[in-house]
């Protein structure tokens, strides 16, 4: 069982096949997704990889987290996640997992936070049918109707589907096909829709209900940075010199 990656949703577009058919795809960007720590059976009771992505401001990182990043010799990460793996799929700490960790044609499961819709009624939130348009119904056409029984049970049960907040839930969409990868730009194109807004964080892992292709790299596709050093950050360009008039 291999590790997954954390990506950022860019948006949706479409690509064309050789036969001229268009395929709707979601573009996911993997940017400096590095292994931050290992979880081992001896120390933690299970085997997993902790990966991080993005660049966090030092002022927003706690002192304890800064110490862990220093041990791993990686820059402070904005988003962290753990992926359960087998012992033969451990990737060295500090290594950067690239977009070609997944291959075109394989299926993946993606997890994200759905778009928030605010307060919603029963028809929008739960697809209720509403009440009749006429025949005695005046201003309750979109209401949910009764919420319980009569004297027995004499209450509304917990988890009854009612109006309330819609969205902002952790959702996993399974068996999305990888259409294309672009390791140079760190892009993964998956067929179909992915939960969440553009710019949201998405976790991508091998599909649990599909067999992993034999061509998939094991333990994964990654590049090790020299001496576990953090990736170089381009310095800000110097301001052009301004000549002063005498």
Swiss-Prot record:
Modification after translation: Methylated by PrmB.
Protein's GO biological process: translation
InterPro entries assigned to the protein according to its UniProt record, in alphabetical order: Ribosomal_uL3, Ribosomal_uL3_bac/org-type, Ribosomal_uL3_CS, Transl_B-barrel_sf
Gene3D superfamilies assigned to the protein according to its UniProt record, in alphabetical order: 3.30.160.810, Translation factors (2.40.30.10)
Cellular component, GO annotation: cytosolic large ribosomal subunit
Pfam families tied to this protein: Ribosomal_L3
Keyword terms, alphabetized: Methylation, Ribonucleoprotein, Ribosomal protein, RNA-binding, rRNA-binding
N5-methylglutamine: residues bearing it: 151
Lineage: superkingdom: Bacteria
GO molecular function, one term: rRNA binding
Segments for region (Disordered): 140-162
Function: One of the primary rRNA binding proteins, it binds directly near the 3'-end of the 23S rRNA, where it nucleates assembly of the 50S subunit.
PANTHER family: 50S RIBOSOMAL PROTEIN L3, LARGE RIBOSOMAL SUBUNIT PROTEIN UL3C
Assembly and binders: Part of the 50S ribosomal subunit. Forms a cluster with proteins L14 and L19.
Family of this protein: Belongs to the universal ribosomal protein uL3 family.
Protein name from the UniProt record: Large ribosomal subunit protein uL3
Encoding gene (name): rplC
């Amino acid at each position: 069982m291999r590790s997954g990656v954390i990506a950022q949703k860019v948006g949706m577009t479409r690509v064309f096949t050789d036969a001229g058919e268009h395929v709707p795809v979601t573009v996911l960007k993997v940017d400096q997704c590095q292994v931050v720590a290992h979880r081992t059976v001896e120390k933690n009771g299970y085997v997993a990889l902790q990966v991080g992505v993005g660049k966090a401001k030092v002022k927003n990182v706690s002192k304890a987290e800064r110490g862990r990043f220093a041990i791993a010799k990686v820059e402070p990460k904005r988003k962290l996640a753990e992926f359960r793996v087998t012992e033969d799929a451990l990737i060295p700490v500090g290594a950067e997992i690239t977009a070609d960790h997944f291959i075109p044609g394989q299926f993946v499961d993606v997890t994200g936070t759905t778009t928030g819709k605010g307060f919603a009624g029963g028809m929008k939130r739960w697809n209720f049918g509403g009440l009749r348009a006429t025949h005695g119904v005046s201003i309750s056409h979109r209401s949910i109707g009764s919420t319980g029984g009569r004297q027995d049970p004499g209450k509304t049960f917990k988890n009854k589907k009612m109006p309330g907040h819609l969205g902002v839930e952790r959702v996993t969409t399974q068996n999305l096909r990888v259409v294309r990868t672009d390791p140079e730009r760190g892009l993964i194109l998956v067929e179909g829709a992915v939960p969440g807004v553009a710019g949201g964080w998405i976790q991508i892992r091998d599909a649990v209900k599909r067999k992993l292709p034999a061509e998939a790299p094991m333990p994964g596709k990654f590049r090790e940075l020299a001496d576990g050093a953090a990736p170089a950050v381009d310095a800000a360009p110097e301001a052009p010199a301004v000549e002063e008039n005498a």
